[in-house]
Design a protein with these regions (language model features):
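Aromatic-lined carbohydrate-binding surfaces of glycoside hydrolases
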Residues: 1-243
Length: 243
């Protein structure tokens, strides 16, 4: 089940509680054993020297732990939805030029260049810190392409980065997953990391992504769970519109 709150959901769980007790009771009665919640890692763990972008992270971590423990009482695990390492506003890169990836001017931000050392080191550190602070977490669910600016090839635009343009897109995905896996399992060896193949393609125009998916899978850590999208290659029809 997806707990539908999105954004900065852990800052005030009294005003906006994503999993109230009555909802958890209903979930448990229906046999639901897990919920996933949107999380933004820099709001839970700061980048050293740029703590101003993470104000309130201590409160968020405490609240996350409270929610995870509450869900656990009902036999339900919280899985954090991670789309990381999340791109940051331009001001962040003025202080951290060694993080800077491709420009995303429509969002007034950049992606993080994971061909550089620091973004992946921080991703591992942040995952370890979050799962240490909230030990009742069941795991995480990762989308590594599309969605939000993350690494330089998140939207198939690695050619705009001099460090990433000649690298295999499969390696860029696998390195992000590996960093998160190391961090999560350093603090919580029993946690599950589920990795979705959403938008996995060599190029954005590709219609057959099977070979590329195989390349990524072959590079993933052996102790993650792979999730495929059920509608790949399926004909669809909604409101008279076929797809």
């Amino acid at each position: 089940s997806y707990a539908a709150s999105c954004g900065d959901i852990f800052i005030d769980i009294e005003k906006r509680d994503p999993v109230p007790e009555n909802l958890l009771q209903q979930y448990a009665s229906m046999g639901i054993r897990g919920v996933w919640m949107h999380a933004i890692l820099y709001l839970l763990h700061p980048v050293k020297g740029s703590e101003e972008f993470s104000r309130g992270y201590e409160t968020r971590l405490r609240n996350l732990s409270v929610l995870a423990e509450r869900c656990k009482k009902y036999g339900i695990g919280i899985y954090l939805y991670l789309n990381e390492p999340r791109g940051m506003p331009y001001a962040f890169y003025e202080k951290n030029p060694d993080w800077a990836g491709v420009d995303v001017p429509r969002n007034h931000m950049r992606a993080n260049c994971t061909s550089r050392q620091k973004p992946l080191e921080w991703l591992e550190e942040a995952c370890a810190a979050v799962f240490e602070a909230a030990p009742a977490l069941a795991g995480a669910f990762m989308i590594t392409m599309s969605e939000n600016p993350t690494h330089c090839n998140y939207a198939f635009n690695k050619t705009a980065c001099p460090l990433c343009r000649d690298r295999d897109g499969a390696d860029l995905i696998a390195e992000v997953v590996a960093a998160a896996e190391r961090g999560i399992h350093a603090s919580s060896p029993g946690a599950k990391l589920l990795v979705s193949d959403w938008a996995w393609r060599e190029k954005g125009t590709d219609t057959d992504n099977a070979a590329f998916k195989r390349k990524v899978i072959d590079r993933l850590p052996k102790n993650v769970w792979f999730m495929s999208i059920s509608e790949w290659g399926k004909e669809t029809g909604a409101g008279g519109v076929k797809g």
